[in-house]
Curated annotation (Swiss-Prot):
It comes from Pyropia yezoensis (Susabi-nori). Homotrimer. Its main location: plastid. The lineage of its organism: Eukaryota, Rhodophyta, Bangiophyceae, Bangiales, Bangiaceae. The modification O-UMP-tyrosine is found at residue 51. One of its GO terms (biological process) is regulation of nitrogen utilization. This is Nitrogen regulatory protein P-II. GO terms for cellular component: chloroplast; cytosol. P-II indirectly controls the transcription of the glutamine synthetase gene (glnA). P-II prevents NR-II-catalyzed conversion of NR-I to NR-I-phosphate, the transcriptional activator of glnA. When P-II is uridylylated to P-II-UMP, these events are reversed. When the ratio of Gln to 2-ketoglutarate decreases, P-II is uridylylated to P-II-UMP, which causes the deadenylation of glutamine synthetase, so activating the enzyme. Pfam families: P-II (PF00543). GO terms for molecular function: ATP binding; enzyme regulator activity. InterPro entries: N-reg_PII (IPR002187), N-reg_PII-like_a/b (IPR011322), N-reg_PII/ATP_PRibTrfase_C (IPR015867), N-reg_PII_CS (IPR017918), N-reg_PII_urydylation_site (IPR002332).
Length: 112
């Protein structure tokens, strides 16, 4: 099993979600996150002074899937979230050792 974590632009969430549902993804975790990187943020004015805001709001989605679906799901996320501009986000892929559904004690794929 793999965990895919994708940091995307907030306005791309619905498009990504719909694309993932089309690929058979039945659920995901969505988290509001903030961070900085190459996008550099923006400059705003307040009472005549300029302020640099370098922490940008993003959305992080997490999905647990079987190893054989990773490449297709990564392609789907990229296609649905890409604008071609700095700040489109990142995708992280990691191994998951075990999943347990708390209510039923189901394990691994039965728990998803």
């Amino acid at each position: 099993m793999k965990k895919i974590e994708a940091i995307i632009r907030p306005f791309k969430l619905n498009e990504v979600k719909l694309a993932l549902v089309k690929e058979g993804i039945g659920g995901m975790t969505v988290i509001k996150v903030s961070g900085f990187g190459r996008q550099k943020g923006q400059t705003e004015r307040y009472k005549g002074s300029e302020y640099s805001i370098d922490i940008i709001d993003k959305i992080k989605i997490e999905i647990i899937i079987s190893d054989d679906k990773v490449e297709k799901i990564v392609e789907t996320i990229i296609k649905a979230s890409k604008t071609g501009e700095i700040g489109d986000g990142k995708i992280f892929i990691s191994s998951i050792e075990r999943v347990i559904r708390i209510r039923t004690n189901d394990l691994n794929f039965e728990a998803l």
